[in-house]
Amino acid sequence: MLFYSFFKSLVGKDVVVELKNDLSICGTLHSVDQYLNIKLTDISVTDPEKYPHMLSVKNCFIRGSVVRYVQLPADEVDTQLLQDAARKEALQQKQ
């Protein structure tokens, strides 16, 4: 649940989601659920010539299992806090 909580804290921020089919979608994070499914608003694709059918899409739902990467705004992410939380959760799972 660590990453779910982390992504919930980024709702309203601009992110780039790269899918396993190499499609990259930029947009505002609207919501995320426990399966890390993502809803984006005000989207645009990074390569509109390759994906012209996506030009008319403004909002989308992305299934968590098709996500390769999520690029986050650097100023919104406290990496030290995230590392500490990941270590704490890993220790709790071992016990």
UniProtKB/Swiss-Prot annotation:
SUPFAM superfamilies: Sm-like ribonucleoproteins. Residues 2-76 form the Sm domain. It is found in: Nucleus. SMART domains: Sm (SM00651). GO terms for cellular component: catalytic step 2 spliceosome; cytoplasm; cytosol; Lsm1-7-Pat1 complex; Lsm2-8 complex; nucleoplasm; nucleus; P-body. InterPro entries: LSM_dom_sf, Sm, Sm_dom_euk/arc, U6_snRNA_Lsm2. GO terms for molecular function: RNA binding; small GTPase binding; U6 snRNA binding. GO terms for biological process: mRNA catabolic process; mRNA splicing, via spliceosome; spliceosomal tri-snRNP complex assembly. The modification Phosphothreonine is found at T79. Keywords: mRNA processing, mRNA splicing, Nucleus, Phosphoprotein, Ribonucleoprotein, RNA-binding, Spliceosome. Component of the precatalytic spliceosome (spliceosome B complex). Component of the U4/U6-U5 tri-snRNP complex, a building block of the precatalytic spliceosome (spliceosome B complex). The U4/U6-U5 tri-snRNP complex is composed of the U4, U6 and U5 snRNAs and at least PRPF3, PRPF4, PRPF6, PRPF8, PRPF31, SNRNP200, TXNL4A, SNRNP40, SNRPB, SNRPD1, SNRPD2, SNRPD3, SNRPE, SNRPF, SNRPG, DDX23, CD2BP2, PPIH, SNU13, EFTUD2, SART1 and USP39, plus LSM2, LSM3, LSM4, LSM5, LSM6, LSM7 and LSM8. Plays a role in pre-mRNA splicing as component of the U4/U6-U5 tri-snRNP complex that is involved in spliceosome assembly, and as component of the precatalytic spliceosome (spliceosome B complex). The heptameric LSM2-8 complex binds specifically to the 3'-terminal U-tract of U6 snRNA. Belongs to the snRNP Sm proteins family. This is U6 snRNA-associated Sm-like protein LSm2. It comes from Homo sapiens (Human). The gene is LSM2.
